[in-house]
A protein has these predicted regions:
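Copper-binding active sites and cupredoxin-like electron-transfer domains
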Residues: 1-891
């Protein structure tokens, strides 16, 4: 049941409030991988953590407080905009009452901006170039990966479909289209609607299509009569929907409460879409971008001031099976119904187009810019729960709310503006980090040129700083060498345990041991002495060494490939000296990589002192990573790192990768089957669903069920956690620290105990360890914690433990072990005091200190008064003596 507080389809009762009164919405989610929720509050604007929005993003174990001052009375919809959730009833109604309040007069002193928009049916080609713009391969080439979507046959439509698109016209006659050359990249998107605070937007909409359609905006204010969503509750209006060949007029306004907040950028990215049937309408193509800016932020032509280039990109899996034109497309393609019935799943998969603005496999018109330009990327998300997109900008970094990133996260009905100042010339990809999405064509090309007369206002001075010697070597890796935690925690036998499918090597399964390739650090270029992994580095597990650098550094990586196939080292966030993709080292070969660290690789103005990145082998980024070749990289502001490499502002650093290692996509699958599979040849079915699932290891640094060691710290220590995520769309991880909280940055600093991670996101959270004991850290997604994505961290209460407890070993691998050693207690003056009594003790000590201070001040005052009186007496005697002497002289 897709429920809000246990109710579906608008049955949640008693959500009523008065207009002009402040309302707090406390939102939280629980559940599984499908519990990606975007709560859309129709008709009103929210403020969340200082930022304006009308949607809230909710995941398992995430908590959001949204503030609202409702303006327009009426009955309004709250809905999850994830398509399947909306369809299945995750909707509620809230009522805004006037409560005898006089509505405030909106001071709309800006322009009236008119747009003439038509819904027109078109024949759309997802791959107009006929080849992959990145690789040059023909889209229909067998085995290319793109042939699944573009090869036309008696059971496949190919890459051309009937769709409907919003198009802009010059006036109400709808005769002459608006032609803007730099908007060719919009593709299937409608025209950009722009406005400033104080403006009124008037949209004359002409539906020239064969279905009823509407326009429903995000991010602006509108009255009930102009809402484009259909309500079926019997009391609200039916929505302002245009029937075929009908014209309707929408009126939206941008009062101050709808514009960017103080912490927001000058412009906010939004979206408009048809909501007559939101799922089928948007899959048919009806969606467009909307830009709302602060007053004075737009030029006369509507472009943003201070921005040289702007691009609007929609990342979504357009499901042609759910388009209004599905039957028409099958009829046009003259498909054989008999063949379709034999392969329904394959046919439906071929119609799910992993598109950027309606283009696949880098067929989006190339996005050109100059080195040093200020580029605004307006990113939009749409779709269902699999539409979790980590948008990666290869070759350059971006800023999101003043924080440095290489990827921006998108979910259905989310909107992000990323600012880039490219300084790395070349041709690069924009792609979705989720491996299956990228393989299915969700990628595009952007080109950074060194333009004549275009001189960037920055100059970099680099200095050689750090050299790392890293070798790729093949090892046998055990994801779960000790099952005692798993069996005790879940209180089940091995066969009945959740982990049985992943850890058993019976019935054709492989168990927990696999051949893998890993990055390991050596002391010098001879690659004879490995750098030992003890103490601070023990927790890294399968990861390569933690590489560190500062802004202005040159990092040199001397890489030896001691594995049996070609591998490389490629890093996010740095400027690689080689042009294009990094060179691969053949088996036995040694290569040297040079990484420059410019300002744009380091922390942004709203970041912590250091930001986290990642490095991995990129010969085949997906198979190489699942084979094990991945490691952490952190870049700090100048002066943060000590000579030995650690941070001067932190006592400890931990890097954790949360990744479902899919051994089915490892280079070593066949070897692992031969080594660990059934002895009888042909016993293992590589395509069996149980076998496929058994090879998906829900790991933290390559370990399951609390087998990761080394997460140990002392009470009062400052700890930096570098939280990393890669993988597929199922790699949604909400990481919960038990008994501790941390600070994280999102424009400002916020306290939490859960951090959200998605493929391609790297977060830094900072903690002061305060609660002694051994505590659980785990992913809160239900399937993931059951599958072993959990571990322990220990906070030691005093330094003498260092002689007996230096790490979490097998003997203390259970949460119960240290719970009798000072857990929940603090040692004060040789006595163990319960943490819960510390506040009382502290209050008493403060009160006693104040009393003692007052007594000391009083005693000091008395002593000072006595001293002053003695001094006055001496002065009087001296004056009298002098007087007697004078009298004697006169006589």
């Amino acid at each position: 049941m897709h429920a809000i507080n246990g109710f579906v389809f608008g049955n949640l009762p008693d959500l009523s409030m008065c207009a002009q009164k402040r309302v707090a919405w406390h939102l939280f989610g629980m559940g599984n991988e499908v519990d990606v929720h975007t709560a859309f509050f129709h008709g009103q604007i929210l403020t969340i953590r200082g930022h304006r929005t009308d949607v809230a993003h909710i995941f398992p174990a995430t908590f959001v407080t949204a503030e609202m001052v409702p303006q327009e009375p009426g009955t309004w919809l709250i809905s999850c905009q994830v398509n399947s959730h909306l369809r299945d009833g995750m909707q509620a109604l809230y009522q805004v009452k006037s409560c005898s309040m006089t509505p405030p007069m909106n001071q709309l002193t800006g322009k009236v901006r008119q747009y003439f928009i038509e819904a027109r049916e078109i024949l759309w080609d997802y791959g107009p170039m006929g080849h992959d713009g990145s690789t040059g391969k023909n889209l229909k080439e067998p085995g290319s990966g793109s042939d699944k979507f573009f090869q036309k046959s008696s059971s496949r439509i190919g890459g051309t479909y009937w769709k409907v698109r919003y198009e802009a016209f010059q006036d109400e006659t709808f005769q002459e289209k608006v032609q803007i050359e730099e908007n060719t990249h919009l593709g299937i998107l409608g025209p950009v609607i722009r406005a400033e605070v104080g403006d009124t937007i008037q949209v004359i909409f002409y539906n020239r299509a064969s279905q009823p359609f509407s326009i429903q905006p995000h991010g602006v204010f509108y009255e009930k009569d102009y809402e484009g969503t259909v309500y079926n509750n019997g009391s609200s209006n039916l929505g302002l929907v245009a029937k075929p060949f009908e014209k309707v007029t929408y009126r939206w306004t941008v009062p101050s409460h709808a514009g960017p907040a103080a912490q927001d950028p000058a412009c906010l990215t939004w979206m408009y879409f048809s909501a007559a049937d939101p799922i089928r309408d948007t899959n048919s193509g009806l969606v467009g971008p909307l830009l709302v800016c602060k007053a004075g932020a737009l030029n006369a032509d509507g472009k943003q001031k201070g921005v040289d280039k702007e691009f609007f990109l929609l990342f979504t899996v357009l499901d042609e099976n759910k388009s209004w034109y599905s039957n028409a497309n099958q009829a046009t393609a003259m498909l054989d119904s008999r063949l379709l019935s034999e392969d329904v799943k394959g046919f439906q998969d071929s119609n799910r187009m992993h598109a950027i603005n309606g283009f696949l496999f880098s067929n989006l018109p190339r996005l050109d810019m100059c080195k040093g330009d200020t580029v605004a990327w307006h990113l939009l998300g749409l779709g269902t729960e699999t539409d979790v997109h980590g948008v990666v900008f290869q070759g350059n970094t971006v800023q999101l709310q003043g924080m440095r990133k290489s990827a921006a996260m998108l979910f259905p009905h989310t909107f992000v503006m990323a600012i880039m100042q490219p300084e790395n010339p070349g041709i690069f990809e924009i792609y979705c980090q989720a491996g299956s999405h990228r393989e299915s064509g969700m990628k595009a090309i952007y080109n950074v040129s060194q333009c004549p007369g275009h001189q960037p206002d920055y100059h970099h001075r680099y200095q050689a700083a750090r050299i790392y010697y890293i070798m790729a070597e093949e090892v046998e890796w055990d994801y779960c060498p000790d099952r005692s935690w798993e069996l005790e925690w879940h209180n089940q036998s091995e066969k009945d345990s959740y982990g049985h499918i992943f850890l058993s090597n019976q019935d054709g399964l492989l168990g927990s041991r696999y051949k893998k390739a890993v990055f390991r650090e050596y002391t010098d270029g001879t690659f004879k002495i490995p750098r030992p992994r003890t103490g601070p580095e023990e927790h890294l597990g399968i990861l390569g060494p933690l590489l560190r650098g500062e802004v202005g550094d040159i990092l040199t990586v001397v890489f030896k490939n001691n594995a049996s196939r070609p591998y490389s080292v490629h890093a996010h966030g740095v400027v690689e000296s080689s042009t294009g993709w990094p060179l691969a080292a053949d088996p036995g070969e040694v290569l040297t990589y040079q990484w420059n660290i410019p300002e744009r690789s380091g922390p942004g103005p709203n970041d912590s002192a250091c930001v986290s990145w990642i490095y991995y082998s990129a010969v085949d980024p997906i198979k190489d990573m699942y084979s094990g070749l991945v490691g952490p990289l952190t870049i700090c502001r100048k002066g943060i790192l000590e000579p030995y490499g650690g941070r001067s502002d932190m006592d400890r650093e931990f890097a954790l990768l949360f990744l479902i290692f899919d051994e089915n996509q490892s280079w070593y699958l066949e070897e692992n089957v031969a080594t660990h599979g059934a002895q009888e040849p042909g016993r293992v079915n590589l395509w069996n669903e149980t076998f496929l699932e058994s090879n998906k290891m829900h790991a933290i640094n390559g370990k399951l069920y609390s087998n990761l060691r080394g997460l140990t710290m002392y009470q009062g220590e400052r700890v930096a956690w570098y939280m990393l995520a890669m993988g597929q769309d199922i790699d949604l991880h909400t990481i919960h620290f038990h008994a501790e909280s941390f600070l994280y940055r999102n424009g400002e600093s916020y306290r939490a105990d859960v951090v959200d991670l998605f493929p391609g996101t790297f977060e830094v959270v900072e903690m002061v360890a305060s609660n002694p004991g051994t505590w659980l850290m785990h992913c809160h997604v239900s399937d993931h914690v059951h599958a072993g994505m959990e571990t322990l961290f220990t906070v030691l209460s005093q330094r003498e433990h260092v002689s007996t407890i230096t790490t979490i070993t097998k003997e203390i691998g259970k949460a119960s072990i240290l719970r009798n050693i000072g857990e929940g207690n603090v040692r004060v003056l040789g006595m163990w005091i319960p943490v819960k009594n510390m506040e009382i003790l502290a209050s008493l000590l403060i009160a006693m200190s104040i009393i003692l201070l007052l007594i000391a001040l009083a005693l000091g005052g008395v002593i000072w008064c006595q001293h002053r009186q003695r001094k006055l007496r001496r002065n009087r005697r001296s004056i009298l003596d002098d007087s007697f002497k004078l009298l004697s002289l006169k006589q």
